[in-house]
Amino acid sequence: MSEKRVQPLARDAMAYVLAGGRGSRLKELTDRRAKPAVYFGGKARIIDFALSNALNSGIRRIGVATQYKAHSLIRHLQRGWDFFRPERNESFDILPASQRVSETQWYEGTADAVYQNIDIIEPYAPEYMVILAGDHIYKMDYEYMLQQHVDSGADVTIGCLEVPRMEATGFGVMHVNEKDEIIDFIEKPADPPGIPGNEGFALASMGIYVFHTKFLMEAVRRDAADPTSSRDFGKDIIPYIVEHGKAVAHRFADSCVRSDFEHEPYWRDVGTIDAYWQANIDLTDVVPDLDIYDKSWPIWTYAEITPPAKFVHDDEDRRGSAVSSVVSGDCIISGAALNRSLLFTGVRANSYSRLENAVVLPSVKIGRHAQLSNVVIDHGVVIPEGLIVGEDPELDAKRFRRTESGICLITQSMIDKLDL
């Protein structure tokens, strides 16, 4: 990312975050919450990354469309994102599916989530709309994408990530020319088209779109009138524009925010238990690819006032310690040993317990002598004394949600079924 140009484009934009998805591949982690509300990084929620990018980019009008099990997400947004000032032309709207257009319809797709709220969006009169997915982990300055959108005269500008070509089969892929104009949009292709001049890589859609607002409103109205449409940006709106208008690809490397340019641009879809575990554990590295300590690009979130973490006991066989770990406030490590683990707020790890490669969500209690490795422990779980996880794959698979790579998800309902 080059030196930032001072432009007012972000102030004329509205960010619209699509946060209604369930995230079913996260299994029990999303039984009680939408994927954007899942905890990440020790104190934040996944949605905080898209919202923080918008705020740090200078965007001061934000809408968040919610749908699936939205209570915890809405509560988080109300508590952590209520600082916008209408008298300064700022706004923050939470937009649950509420059958505004039809008495029988919820949001039928991503485009429909915009269409059903046209009467809320249009009075703000933003010049540009930045459509964002609320369930990805990355840091990006949207001002650069807005500038490219204006300079290119595009109808839509699509954020794209360069990925090895044969890893792009699970994405929507952009087939572009030498000017990064999109010739074709292919959903999950078996043979992804390469990038001109770099054929070993493909441009995968990040689910980030920039439109002139007037054009977008016309597009979603036209789509709503089409009985054959699935009401989706990736399946309907974008392919229509590629065929009938001008679509341009914006490369994430041109606008990603990173503290060290030796690192590759960081973007993660933490949509599986393995990916979620790995992205959190990566934060325990000496210099992680994702810098959450960058004061120039903070990740804003709701944070309760908590006491600091505490480590107690220093006996030979009972020493409160943590190595290569992230430990949040209000944690008490009472004679327990942590290695390469990430603990959210309010965790209690009792004497003689050991955690290795563990992601522990808030308010978890670890019983004495528990030995846990390669785990994700859900919010509020009480781990019984002496429980061992990570040593017997067959037993772990019977008791918990164990992935093929050996990561175990532990929830309270699973613990309650144990015969200990």
Curated annotation (Swiss-Prot):
Gene Ontology molecular function: any one: glucose-1-phosphate adenylyltransferase activity
Pfam family membership, one: NTP_transferase
Catalyzed reactions per annotation: alpha-D-glucose 1-phosphate + ATP + H(+) = ADP-alpha-D-glucose + diphosphate
Binding-site residues for alpha-D-glucose 1-phosphate, renumbered to this chain: Y107, G172, E187, K188, S205
GO BP of this protein: glycogen biosynthetic process
Record InterPro entries: ADP-Glc_PPase (IPR011831), ADP_Glu_pyroP_CS (IPR005836), GlgC_bac (IPR023049), GlmU/GlgC-like_hexapep (IPR056818), NTP_transferase_dom (IPR005835), Nucleotide-diphossugar_trans (IPR029044), Trimer_LpxA-like_sf (IPR011004)
Pathway participation: Glycan biosynthesis; glycogen biosynthesis
Enzyme Commission no: 2.7.7.27
Domain of life: Bacteria
Purpose of the protein: Involved in the biosynthesis of ADP-glucose, a building block required for the elongation reactions to produce glycogen. Catalyzes the reaction between ATP and alpha-D-glucose 1-phosphate (G1P) to produce pyrophosphate and ADP-Glc.
Family as reported in the entry's similarity comment: Belongs to the bacterial/plant glucose-1-phosphate adenylyltransferase family.
Subunit details: Homotetramer.
Protein name: Glucose-1-phosphate adenylyltransferase
